[in-house]
Regions:
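Extracytoplasmic/secreted envelope proteins and their assembly/folding machinery
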Residues: 71-78, 99-103, 107, 124, ...
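Glycine-rich beta-to-alpha active-site loop
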Residues: 107, 111-147
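Transmembrane alpha-helices and immediately adjacent membrane-cytoplasm interface residues
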Residues: 3-33
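STAS-typified acidic loop motif
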Residues: 41-73
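Short, glycine-/small-residue-enriched flexible loop/hinge segments at domain edges that mediate gating
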Residues: 83-98, 112-118
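Terminal peptide-recognition signature
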Residues: 62, 87, 127, 199
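Acidic/histidine-rich, surface-exposed loop or edge segments in extracytoplasmic proteins
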Residues: 53-62, 83-86, 145-151
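Charged, glycine-interspersed solvent-exposed loop segments at helix/strand-loop junctions
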Residues: 149-209
Length: 209
């Protein structure tokens, strides 16, 4: 099982589980000739998001779900475009582990982050990893508790500890404690959208629009 940080995860994972189950039986019906099942699933995952580089090569736009394989493809995009300076985000979230991998790449390379419309749940890990963090007018940032993609519990996985791990990362990026204490108060079925001034005062945003 995997940890998801996107409020659309419940519906999406239900659909995904059906795709996976039927795909094992009927994959040949919708699979190009010669395509392996693993290749098909990678293609489906890639279709959930877009990575688009600006004409001048300085901005990489991420749009869609942060899903399986995302962090590797994101890192490859960074390698292919060494002139990138800013990551532009529009995502409702997705897979926490994939988001952590991408966030580390952003932090290591000292890239800036900018939310163009919405950056919620797992997407906020990418956002807070930025050196300079800004928000477009009307854009929003959303937070909620983590949830499992399948089932309600796993014996070796503590969601509270996973949240604490990411809270420590947020704090290391300059986000203040009162804000951190509110980040995971909402259930995984709802979202907390802080006001713009709250984001500024907390240190979550640190650059003008």
């Amino acid at each position: 099982a995997f940890i998801w940080g996107g409020y659309s995860a419940f519906a999406l994972t239900a659909v995904f589980s059906l795709i996976l189950w039927w795909g094992l039986i009927l994959s040949s019906l919708a699979t190009p000739e010669g395509e392996l099942f693993t290749e098909k699933m990678d293609r489906l995952h890639r279709s959930a998001y877009q990575l688009q580089v600006s004409e001048d090569g300085t901005r990489l736009k991420i749009q869609g779900e942060i899903t399986f394989g995302f962090s590797n493809n994101f890192l490859q995009a960074l390698k292919d475009h060494p002139g990138l300076k800013t990551i532009v985000l529009n995502s409702q979230g997705g897979h926490i582990y994939e988001a952590r991998g991408a966030a580390k790449s952003i932090q290591d390379k000292g890239l800036n982050t900018h939310a163009s419309r919405e950056c919620s749940s797992a997407c906020t890990l990418l956002f807070v990893a930025g050196r300079k963090r800004s928000l477009a007018p009307g854009a929003k940032i959303g937070f909620h508790q983590y949830a499992l993609s399948f089932g309600n519990s796993l014996p070796n996985l503590d969601l509270q500890k996973e949240q604490e791990k990411d809270l420590a990362f947020f704090q290391s990026q300059g986000v203040k404690l009162p804000f951190l204490n509110r980040m995971f108060q909402h259930s995984s079925k709802t979202l907390w959208y802080p006001e713009y001034q709250e984001l500024i005062d907390s240190g979550f945003l640190n650059s003008p629009n």
